[in-house]
Each structure stands twice: as structure tokens, then as C-alpha cells.
Amino acid sequence: MNKDLVIYFSVYGTAKMTAEEIAKQTGADLMEIIPEVPYDSSRDHYNALARLAKKEHDEGRRPAIKNELPIKDYDRIFIGYPMWWYTFPMIIYTLFDQYDFSGKTIIPFNTHMGSEDGGTYDTIRELEPGATVFPGLPIEMQSAERGPEKAVHEWLGKLGI
């Protein structure tokens, strides 16, 4: 039997809601990717967050991860994140820089406002050539906010999970 983990990064909570639903439907353990320096989660400051995300991306920053993630203890790992500037947040690059996913199965999922996965699933395949990367779930942010249950159930069914 596979030992499953759902890890996610979320500022506004939509990736978190989706992660929680995946963990619920699969029985996987659940862990948040916590940045060393927290992002402002106030929706009133969305534009400031967008500018910061763009700056991190343009400068190739790798924000530090505060918590230890027990990647080595799991066989199958769901990785979730929001889309920022048509890609994943730079802290996800930090995740792939810090942890070895060789021999693991990675199942990505993301929330978005129209950009689908933005090619991030292919980027994960490039960053982690020793891992098996399953087809991901891009879920529109408003759909996630209304409840990701159906989308998650259908996606997991297509994956045979």
C-alpha cells in the first residue's frame, strides 16, 4: 500500500481547501508548506502580493521554507499551489531544490484564475526527472471556493486512486 502525503502552499486558502479535500478522499496525511517570511493573506493587499510575487519570480528568489517536510517517508505525494504570474510561486522551486523526489510519485494540483496549470506540470517533470509525475488537477479559484469535492472526486477517479 502506498503511503500518501498531500503538501500544499496557500495564501488565500483555495489551495488549502483543495488539499484538505484530496487528503479527505484519499486518507493521505496533510502538511502545509510554511514560508519563513509569511505572505500577507489580506485580500485587501492582493496587488501588493502580486507585485511581490512578480519581483520574486523576476529575481529568481527562493523563499525559505520554515517547516521540515517528511518527503522521504512517503511514496506518493500530492503537491498543491496557487498560480502566480502564470507559474507556481517561487517557494515551490525551493521545495524542489531542497527535497529529493527521485523514485516518488508526484501528483500536482493547483488553483488558478484562468491560466490552468500554466505548464507547471511539465516544469515539475523537468525539475524532478527521477520522479513519476501524474496528470494534475487545475481547479479554477472560484470553483475551489464553492467546494472542490466533485472536481477532486472525478480527477482521482481518472487517476485510478
Each PLM stretch: what is its role?
Residues 6, 79, 108-110, 135:
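Structural beta-sheet core signal
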